[in-house]
Amino acid sequence: FVFVDISGFTNFTNENGDDAAGRLLASWRAVTRDVASETGVRIAKWLGDGCMLVAVDQRDAVRFCLELQKRSASACAPLSIRVGIASGLALLFEGDDYIGTAVNLAARLCDAAASYEVIIPVDQIENLPEGVIAIPHEPLTLRGLNEAINVVTLTGEATDVARNDTGELWTRSPFVM
């Protein structure tokens, strides 16, 4: 699970007005949709100036996060994003929402992340894409959790090929004439 938040959006809205905030958000959401499509990650829901995403493969989630971070530099300038990633089981609740420990952890990690930061628990790293580096981070004490969580910050650029959720299907015969 991935949670993304635009840092400073409330202050930006207060200083620049609703119209400017709406334009920035529309720009960022368009970029987010593109990156999700290119990496095979699904946007589960929009959360105002953020979103929750679901990925089957952790490498796809990491590719998504780092690519979105890069593209958000211009899409939501002068603001930045912060990201939390967590893996685990969850319940699909009433057909359109996910609940569970992994979901809560990803949301709390996003809240704790600094601008331009992508964080993940150390014990949940499964298989990072080539080119991605895990940098030690101080343990985090998160709201609702009894113990500090050991996390790392992910940085770098995935050099292995990202999956495209539609290109693989629609560019092959019999769909191409």
Predicted regions and their residues:
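Catalytic NTP-binding/metal-coordinating core of nucleotidyl cyclase/transferase enzymes
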Residues: 1-63
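Generic signal for short, ordered secondary-structure residues
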Residues: 11, 15, 40, 88-89, ...
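Residue-level detector of alpha-helical recognition elements and their boundaries
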Residues: 24, 36, 47, 66, ...
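Catalytic beta-strand-to-alpha-helix segment of the class III nucleotidyl cyclase homology domain
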Residues: 52-161
